[in-house]
Amino acid sequence: VATETTISPSPAILIEAHQWAELSSILSARLPGRRVWAFGSRTTGRRVKRFSDLDLLIEGESLSLREAALLDEDLDESRLPFKVDIVDLSTITPEFRARIEPEMVLVQG
């Protein structure tokens, strides 16, 4: 059963509109039907700089090696001027999740 993917039109993350358009295009193409959350300095505004990385948490089944490689390739080849770190929800500890939960912003799902 295919799941419809919803992209937040204006997430509360500190990136420019054209960067959001490019990122959301990559996410919807590579992670259809998956919930994706942003967290870290780009959601809290603390110590964020122009080239600060963007942390994304992926829900659902773990990405296959192929899926992860294609996503990484698309992000690396994008015009985004910052690194995007992908974190798989199934690999984090309950303590880490509890720490980041207050700053998580849904960007797709």
Locations of the language-model features?
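Catalytic core of pol beta-like nucleotidyltransferases
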Residues: V1-R35, T43-R50, E59-G109
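Short, well-ordered beta-strand segments
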Residues: D55-L57
